[in-house]
UniProtKB/Swiss-Prot annotation:
Binding site for L-serine: 238-240, 292, 391
Keyword terms, alphabetized: Aminoacyl-tRNA synthetase, ATP-binding, Cytoplasm, Ligase, Nucleotide-binding, Protein biosynthesis
Protein's cellular compartments: Cytoplasm
Protein name, UniProt field: Serine--tRNA ligase
The reaction(s) this protein catalyses: tRNA(Ser) + L-serine + ATP = L-seryl-tRNA(Ser) + AMP + diphosphate + H(+); tRNA(Sec) + L-serine + ATP = L-seryl-tRNA(Sec) + AMP + diphosphate + H(+)
Organism for this UniProt entry: Bdellovibrio bacteriovorus (strain ATCC 15356 / DSM 50701 / NCIMB 9529 / HD100)
Comment on protein domains: Consists of two distinct domains, a catalytic core and a N-terminal extension that is involved in tRNA binding.
Pfam families for this protein: Seryl_tRNA_N (PF02403), tRNA-synt_2b (PF00587)
């Protein structure tokens, strides 16, 4: 959420933060109308507060005169009537100011974050900037199959029966695919906790609406989540939501920053707006597993932490020997709450394309302001932390990448060396 007070101040460049934020919205391809409405409403709110304070001061002054008049035996009825009028005015003005304040808050909740200055300006994924390529895209002497063809041929993925029991965008993993999914989760969690020092966490798989508001999913993306009817509970779209809200409305000690967590969870998404996209296979499911990295960082260190977090996600791909690239998203392709995002895209030979397998973002204080997560230095005032998170990795898409990159001409699939100890020493998948 944006800092309304900051919008009224001058930036170090000499321009106002309002102008900078407005330009940030333009760079995102977002409307600036709401920002302008916020400024007008905030101006109105201040005027109403001033009027209420003036009326209150007059009321207090007259109230003081009433006692004097009564002590002198005079008639204070006229002043009493005037005080009653002022009391009514104060209540009305304060109510209008509170209403304007709520309107400002409601509007502020639907404005996206301001992009960091290092983010390239662009309108779509074609304007994203390739940062690096790791590994050579896998090429075969035979026609590469897509993962769903391999999964069905090996009898380890069943989409048809999932469609019968549940519906579209679901799958049964069985045999070697189920074993590999479980092995990947364990492998990723071990790597992040044992090598990189993240604290393991398994969060609740349901959250309340306040938590979704804190991360920026609500109110703008309410249609993207599954709601448990008759309650204030929602299935999580990502572990980012419960883990970010772990410190909701708390003040941390500066010396305890950064705090880093790795969390496994299933994720549930309605995929509203994705009609016709990736309708076959595991790429876009209503339910999928993911390992998430989450860091609460000092504002002075957050962009340094962002680089480290992204490299930790990359390490999983390198250990599995999967070709990938890192892409810096442009302003028009970033998520709503992000100030800067790197996507990791893994090579899929069956599609002959790079596909997203991880998104690593620095939200700066955008989420912390919404969820009221702060830290305090010794003797200092509370400040908002910076929050960062990244998929490390989307487990189903990692399974997809292994099937497609390790496929063989005879229809079998090899298992990455790093994963073999997690699969009982198994080296391949055959029917």
């Amino acid at each position: 959420m944006i800092d309304i007070k900051l919008l009224e101040k001058k930036a170090e460049t000499g321009t106002s933060y309002y102008d900078e934020y407005k330009q940030g919205l333009v760079n995102r391809g977002a409307s600036t109308e709401v920002l302008e409405q916020i400024m007008e409403l905030n101006k109105k709110r201040k005027e109403l507060i001033t009027q209420a304070e003036t009326a209150k001061a007059s009321q207090n002054k007259l109230s003081g005169e009433i006692g004097k008049i009564k002590r002198e035996g005079g008639d204070a009825s006229a002043i009493l009537a005037e005080v009653d009028v002022l009391k009514t005015q104060v209540k009305e003005l304060e109510a209008k100011a509170a209403e304007a304040d709520q309107q400002v808050t409601n509007l502020a909740l639907v404005i996206p974050n301001k992009p960091h200055s290092s983010v390239p300006v662009g309108s779509s994924e074609k304007d994203n900037k390739e940062i690096k390529v790791v590994g050579t895209p896998t090429q075969f002497s035979f026609k590469a199959k897509e993962h769903w063809e391999l999964g069905e041929a090996l009898n380890i993925i069943d989409f048809e029966r999932a469609g019968k029991t549940t519906g579209t965008r679901f799958a049964f993993l069985k045999g070697a695919a189920a074993q590999m999914e479980r092995a990947l989760i364990q492998f990723m969690m071990d790597k992040h906790s044992m090598k990189h020092g993240y604290t393991e966490m398994i969060p609740p798989f349901m959250v309340n609406s306040n938590s979704l508001l804190g991360t920026g999913n609500f109110p703008k993306f309410k249609e993207d989540v599954f709601h448990l009817e008759g309650s204030d509970l929602y299935l999580i779209p990502t572990a980012e939501v419960p883990v970010t809200n772990y410190y909701n409305n708390e003040i941390l000690d500066e010396k305890d920053l950064p705090q880093s967590f790795c969390a496994y969870s299933p994720c549930f998404r309605s995929e509203a707006g994705s009609a016709g996209r990736d309708t076959k296979g595991l790429i876009r499911q209503h339910q999928f597993d993911k390992v998430e990295l989450m860091v609460f960082a000092h504002p002075d260190k957050s962009h340094e932490v962002h680089e480290a977090l992204t490299s930790h996600a990359e390490q999983i791909l390198m250990d599995l020997e999967l070709p990938f690239r890192r892409v810096l998203l442009c302003t028009g392709d970033m998520g709503f709450g992000s100030a800067k995002t790197y996507d990791l895209e893994v090579w899929l030979p069956g599609q002959n394309a790079y596909r997203e397998i991880s998104s690593c973002s620095n939200f700066e204080d955008f989420q912390a302001r919404r969820a009221n997560i702060r830290f305090r230095s010794a003797g200092g005032k509370p400040q908002f932390v910076h929050t960062l998170n990244g998929s490390a990795l989307a487990v189903g898409r990692t399974l997809v990448a292994i099937l497609e990159n390790y496929q063989r001409e005879d229809g079998s699939v090899g298992i990455p060396k790093a994963l073999q100890p997690y699969m009982g020493g198994r080296t391949e998948i055959r029917k």
